[in-house]
Amino acid sequence: VRIIEQDKRAYMNYCTFSYSARWWDWERWEREIDYMAMRGINMPLSIVGYEAVLFYTLRDLGYTDDGALNFISGPAYLPWQLMGNLDSYFSLTDKAYVDKRLELGKKIIDRELELGMTPIQQGCSGQVPSTILRVLPHTNAYNVPSWCGFPVTYQIDPLDKNFRKFGMALLEKQRQLFGAHHYYACDPFHENKPPIKGDKYLQNVGKAISEMYTAFDSQAVWVMQAWSLREPIVKA
């Protein structure tokens, strides 16, 4: 008998999905999930297949297949895109790959749910393609400073009405493809500087994201990585 005091027992971080799990097939994932269950894990980060959420959301907004694929970073870099550090780096070129990842991601979440786990899903911090004005005119978007020498990324102003529109579109597409399981991870300006200085801007970001989550899911819990916490965002 294994007794674990902690109620919430999370497993894996974003980097793991590139450092270790990038090329895992279903057989390897099933073995990992069974191992999680045996060790008492009940809240695994579950982002496999998020390529499909990005792709089909952008398609719904009016992007072409190539335009949507271009925003999605390649296999080795996608987790850093989901942390907001980069985008469009060694971009995808094949929609069939997106659909293959979608199928694998569904199997993973189904198995986690079957074993009584609660998947932590991807949230939204307002990161958008640099071409967002083509489909959402008059959107107020900023350049976010370069992270580790990668090209700059783009962030919708949290006070802009399209901040919630874009974020809700992503969350709804994720629900359609994978279900909604109440825990949503995102780390605004992870290991980077915000585009605007001052606590007020960070408070606006935190408030906008929190209100978006609860509007989408009344049971929503925002999950963040501890080492990049910003107090004004957390307390907003």
Each language-model region and where it sits:
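Aromatic-lined carbohydrate-binding surfaces of glycoside hydrolases
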Residues: 3-236
